[in-house]
């Protein structure tokens, strides 16, 4: 897609540091990616444990948030499921290899080559992913779900990650 994605995020420099609003540059979107303008993000216990480094291995500076709802702002040339203006949600994953047995069987959370978490994971470009307490996020289209009209973003965000456990990728 060849576009630079800048986003203000709510980030901590360390577990002890206060949250700060800073601007980051998201990775360049690829042809199978969706750029989302975030409208709401839920707060999950895992966000709290991670940002406080209670589970170890947190990579700082860090922006958490994996319950995301927003509007599609841009799509890559090979994106087929979404278009600009669609209402969408994102859960705890933003990518996987897509090729191993687990991924081919719809079990991307068990990717044998390492899935990419919404935050605190190594992304496809080698950077550490930053979560949804932000203005924008870049996600592989396979990890985006539709939010139907009539459901508020703040209601959809906390359940957006459930599309990984449901037999459908839509919140209907």
Task: Tell me what each language-model feature is.
Residues 162-168:
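Conserved small/polar residues in nucleotide/adenosyl-binding loops
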Residues 11-18:
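Extracellular beta-rich ligand/substrate-recognition surface
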Residues 3-9:
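Short structural boundary motif marking the start of a folded domain
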Residues 151-157:
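Short pre-catalytic strand/loop immediately N-terminal to key active-site residues, enriched for Gly-Thr
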Residues 25-41, 54-104, 109, 130, ...:
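Glycine-rich beta-strand-centered segment in the early N-terminal region that forms part
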Residues 92-136, 141-142:
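Cysteine-cluster motifs in flexible loop/terminal segments that predominantly coordinate metals
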Residues 50-52:
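Short Gly/aromatic-enriched secondary-structure transition segments
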Residues 46-48:
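Cytochrome P450 core scaffold surrounding the K-helix E-X-X-R motif
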């Amino acid at each position: 897609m060849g576009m630079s994605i800048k986003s203000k995020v709510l980030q901590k420099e360390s577990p002890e540091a206060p949250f700060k609003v800073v601007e980051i540059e998201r990775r360049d979107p690829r042809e199978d990616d969706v750029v989302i303008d975030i409208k709401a993000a839920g707060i999950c216990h895992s966000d709290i444990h991670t940002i406080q480094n209670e589970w170890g291995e947190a990579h700082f500076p860090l922006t958490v948030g994996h319950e995301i709802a927003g509007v599609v702002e841009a799509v890559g040339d090979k994106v087929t499921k979404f278009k600009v203006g669609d209402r969408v949600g994102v859960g705890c994953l933003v990518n996987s290899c897509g090729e191993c047995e687990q991924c081919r069987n719809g079990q991307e959370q068990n990717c044998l080559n390492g899935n990419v978490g919404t935050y605190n994971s190594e992304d496809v470009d080698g950077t550490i992913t930053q979560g949804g307490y932000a203005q924008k996020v870049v996600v592989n289209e396979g990890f985006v779900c539709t939010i139907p009209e009539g459901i508020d973003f703040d209601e959809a965000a906390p359940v957006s990650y459930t599309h990984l456990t449901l037999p459908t990728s839509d919140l209907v």
